[in-house]
Each structure stands twice: as structure tokens, then as C-alpha cells.
Amino acid sequence: MEKFTTLEGVAAPLRTINVDTDRIIPAKYLKTIRRTGLGKSLFAEMRYREDGSENPDFILNQPAYRNSKILVCGDNFGCGSSREHAPWALADFGIRCVISTSFADIFFNNCAKNGILAIVVSPEDLEKLFEDAERGANATLTVDLAAQTIRGPDGGTLHFDVDEGRKHNLLNGLDEIGLTLERVSSIDAYEQKLAQRTWA
């Protein structure tokens, strides 16, 4: 998993509230267990018209936001079913950070397991970030995970909270397997000690 330290770039504003996982990636695209190739289907029903052409009104189809790695989202982002394909699609598109006032719990946890930092902010801070993002290519956000800050294009900074375990894993690029391998010496020592306790 790619490490997450500092991320700087244009943020795409998606003001829609209650975007569920079926809108993030519709069920018809869930026939694969591969994490790659799903980016083209991200927000498919919003990104594309019925004839398959791009919807020019959708934010990620607009020139300033095509390569956005940060998504500023409306309330309750990632609600609905627990499909892990939703963060897979975001990551495959290139999104590394999503910011909202609230996320569905399972989606929130799945993001961290797939290298995406999900940040919860206050409604007031979210509105400021929306305003910054809506300035387009002339305004960038900088997300610093170590410092737990988001710096806006005018230099203003806001602080966010993050679980220490989640922070450690993202900073070091550790998924659950990587975290286990990081502790393999402790696991080996425990197993050796257990083997000596034949009565256990």
C-alpha cells in the first residue's frame, strides 16, 4: 500500500449529500475482485450519459478537476451497502483523501484499509473547503497527515483528528497484512514461548 504523508493538489467539490456506495460504483461493476480498472466506473451514473458519453456537468469531468486526488464531499458520504469496491474505485481513479462532515462507518474503515485518508470536519470547515475547491485550478489544498492539518490556498490551516493506529498505518503504507508482517518478530517470540508451555 502506498504511504500517505503529505498530499497537495486541486480538490474536487462534490456537494451532493448521502452519496451511497451504489452511486460511488454501481452494482453492475462489482463482478471483479481485482482492485484495478474500477476507476473508469467511479460515479458512473453521474459521470456518463445514457449513450456512454461524458456528462460535462459532473465535477470530475471538468478540466480543472480531472486529476483531483482530494474529494470534498457532502454529508454522509459512503452510506449504503458495505462494498469494498467503493474505496477501490476511488483509489484506482487517483483519489487519496476524502473530506466530509460524516461517513458511513464501514466505508470510513475500508478507506483506511485501502490507503485513502477519510477526514471528518465541522460543517463550517467543510463549507470553507467547498469554497476553496470551487476556485478550481487556481487553488490547491495541502493535507499533512503527520501534522493533522489541511492548509488552504490562502494559507489558512485547520486541524483534524485521526485515530493513532489508522495514522500509523497510512503514514507507513501498511494494510492489515503489512501490519502483521511489521510485528512478525513479536508473533514468533510469542509462539516460541507458547511452545515451551506444554500445559497451555
From Swiss-Prot:
Pathway: Amino-acid biosynthesis; L-leucine biosynthesis; L-leucine from 3-methyl-2-oxobutanoate: step 2/4. GO terms for cellular component: 3-isopropylmalate dehydratase complex. It is an enzyme of class 4 (lyase). Gene3D superfamilies: Aconitase, domain 4 (3.20.19.10). It catalyses: (2R,3S)-3-isopropylmalate = (2S)-2-isopropylmalate. Pfam families: Aconitase_C (PF00694). One of its GO terms (biological process) is L-leucine biosynthetic process. One of its GO terms (molecular function) is 3-isopropylmalate dehydratase activity. Keywords: Amino-acid biosynthesis, Branched-chain amino acid biosynthesis, Leucine biosynthesis, Lyase. Its EC number is 4.2.1.33. Belongs to the LeuD family. LeuD type 1 subfamily. Catalyzes the isomerization between 2-isopropylmalate and 3-isopropylmalate, via the formation of 2-isopropylmaleate. Heterodimer of LeuC and LeuD. PANTHER family: 3-ISOPROPYLMALATE DEHYDRATASE SMALL SUBUNIT (PTHR43345:SF5), 3-ISOPROPYLMALATE DEHYDRATASE SMALL SUBUNIT 2-RELATED-RELATED (PTHR43345). This is 3-isopropylmalate dehydratase small subunit. It comes from Methylobacterium radiotolerans (strain ATCC 27329 / DSM 1819 / JCM 2831 / NBRC 15690 / NCIMB 10815 / 0-1). The gene is leuD.
